[in-house]
Amino acid sequence: MKNISKGKILIPEEVIPIKDHQTISKKLVDLYDLHILLMSLDQNTDVSPEFFAEERLYFVLKGELKFNNEKLLNNELILFEKNKLFGIEAREKSIFLEIAVDLEEDEMKNIEKGKKIKLTNCLDYVEGGIANIDLVSKDEFKVFLMAFDAGEGLKPHKAPGDALVMALEGKAKLLVGEKEIEIQSGEQIVFPANVIHNVTAITRFKMLLILSIDK
C-alpha cells in the first residue's frame, strides 16, 4: 500500500483532508486488477452515477453517504456488482474507501450485493474464542471480519502483503515488529508485509481486515 503510514495508528481525517466543495482521492493500491482509493467528499457534494466493469466495494469511515437508495453510516459497507449504475451523495462531510476488483461469484462470500451491511452485526462474539468470516476471498486479495472475546488473541505471525485493519468495536493491543500499540473503535492501522504482528483483545473487539498481496 502507498500514500498511507504503516505500523502506526491512523485517524481518517489525518490521512485525507475534507475540503469545502471538493472531492479528494488517494490511491492506496493501484494494480492492474485491483485498486483501493481513500476518498473524501464535502457535505452536499456527489459522484455522478456511472457503470463500472468490475465490482465496487465501499466502506464508510466517517460521515453519511447515499448510494442510490441506500444510506450508509460509519462502519457500514456496500458491494455493487459489475455493470450496475449507481452514484454517491454526501449528506455530511464524509470519508470512505472504494475498492474496485474483478470477482467471480464464489469469491464474494456472505455478502448481499446492493444492500448495506452494518459490519458489527455480521459476526457474533464467541465466549473464550475468536470468530472470523470472509466477505471477499481471492488468492491475492481478501476482506474479512474478526471478533475477539476479551483477552483472546492471535499468535505473532507475518503476512505476504500489507493488511489494513479497521477497528469497529472495542479495544485491542497490537504488536507491530517490536512495538506494542493500542487501537480502539474508529481507528485504523496498516500491518506492513512480512513484519511480525499480532492482535490481542483488551475488551471484546471487532475489526475489518483488508489484505492486498502484490505479486
Predicted regions: what they are:
Residues 1-33, 74, 93-95, 100-140:
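A short, N-terminal "cap"/entry segment at the start of jelly-roll beta-barrel domains
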Residues 21-24, 33-52, 128-131, 142-159:
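Conserved short histidine dyad/triad with adjacent acidic residue
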Residues 53-67, 161-177:
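Glycine- and acidic-residue-biased ligand/ion/polar-headgroup-sensing regions
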Residues 69-85, 177-194:
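Short acidic-glycine-tyrosine-enriched beta hairpin
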Residues 32, 68, 91, 175-179:
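Short strand-coil-strand connectors
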Residues 71-73, 82-106, 193-215:
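Ligand-binding loop in jelly-roll beta-barrel domains
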Residues 61-62, 92, 168-169, 184-185, ...:
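A cytosolic small-molecule/anion-sensing beta-strand core signal
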